Amino acid sequence: MRKNSIIFLLYLITFSAFGEIITSEKFSYSIDFPEGYEITDMEQDESTAIFKNKYLQAHALIRVWPQSKFKSADEALKDTLARLKASADYSESVWRRQKCSIASFESPLLLPDGTLSQGWAAAIPLPQKKGYLSILSYSPKTVYDDLAQVLISLLDSVLIDAGSFREPGLITTAFYPRKSPKNISISVAGKSIPSQIDSIDAEASQFVIDREFSVFSFYAANNLPEMYDAWIRFYRLLARDSMERVKKVSFDLYTFLLEECEKKDSANPQAALAQVLLNWSQDFHYERKSSSYDKADIESIPAILEGGSSDCDGRSLLLMCLLKNCSIDSCMFISAQYSHALLGVFLPDKQGQTIHVDDNEGGKDYIVGETTAKGLTLGMMPADMTDRKNWMAVELP
C-alpha cells in the first residue's frame, strides 16, 4: 500500500490524493481521503491545510492546535468553529481511548464567495501530546444533501496511530457505540466453535457499507480515472471497519483450530489454518445481497458470521480480516474484468498460483484462494481468470 507524506511548502499549491493515504509525519496523523481531493493552501509549519475536491463541491480544512492551547478536544473544536462564526450541534465520543468532539455545523466564512457552508467537524487529541487535530469537512449548504456521505466518509477516515488502521472510524464509533456481546456459533472443520460479536456490529457495518458505496458510486457512474482507486478504497474501509469487530472471532478460531493445523502441517501450520478457513467459506450459502445498481451487493462481515448470505467479495474480505487478526499476512484481490474476488495469503513456502503485489521493498507474491468453488485448495484459481494484470489488491497496513 502506498503511503505519502505531505510536505507543506508554500510554493506547493496542489497535491492529489488519488486514493492514497495522506500522512503528516510531523503531527502523526493520516487521512484516507476519497479520491480527487487536492491541497489548495497550507501553512509552512503544517498546522493548517485546505483541500478541495476537483470533481465535487466538497472541501476540507485541517487545523492542528498546540496541546497547551486547550484543555480538551471539545474546547478546541468549539473555539475553531467560533472563529468561523459557525452554528453547531456538538457531541463527544471516546475513540482510540481518547475523548473526541464531533459537530454538525453551518458557517458563512469558509467558502471564498461567502455563501453558507454546511458540514461535519471533529477534534481529536493527537498521540504524544502533539496537539488537537481539528478537521472540517463541508460543502455549500445548497448541495449538502448530495454530498453528506462524502463529507462524513472523510471524517471517518482519519487515522492517528497504527491501531486506528484496524478499527471503526470516529464517526461510525460515535453513531454506533458498543452495546452488548452477542453469542454466535461457528461450524468449521467439524467443530462448533462458540464466539462473540457485539450486538450493534452488523448494523454499524451496514452503515459503513451503504455510505462508502454511495461515495464509490459517484466515481463509477461518471467513469472517472480514479474509479478503480475508489473501488479499492471502498473495500479497504470495509476491512478497516471489520477488523476489530471480528477480533474475538479470529482469536477463538485460532485457539480451537491451531492444534489440528499443527498436526496437518507441522512445518507450516499457518498454511493449514488458511486452508481450513478457505474450505469453511466455500460451504457458505451463496447469494448476492442486492441486484439493484444503486445498492451494495456485499453482506457485512458480522452478518456473514451470523449466517447471512455471501459471495466472493464478502467471503474474501472476511477471510482477509480473520487471517490478519491471526498475524497471517493476507489481502483481497478484486477484478472488474472477471467480476470476481479472491483471497490472497502470503505463504512463501506454499506452492500454487500467486499474484504479485508491489511495495517499497520489492513486493510479495500472495497465494490465491477461491472462496466460491467447493474443493479448490489454496493456490488454485479459475483457468479463465489467470491474467494477473486484471487483478487489483485490497490491503491493510
Question: What is each stretch, according to the model?
Answer:
Residues 37-38, 135-174:
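Surface-exposed amphipathic alpha-helical segments
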Residues 2-11:
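Sec-dependent signal peptide recognition
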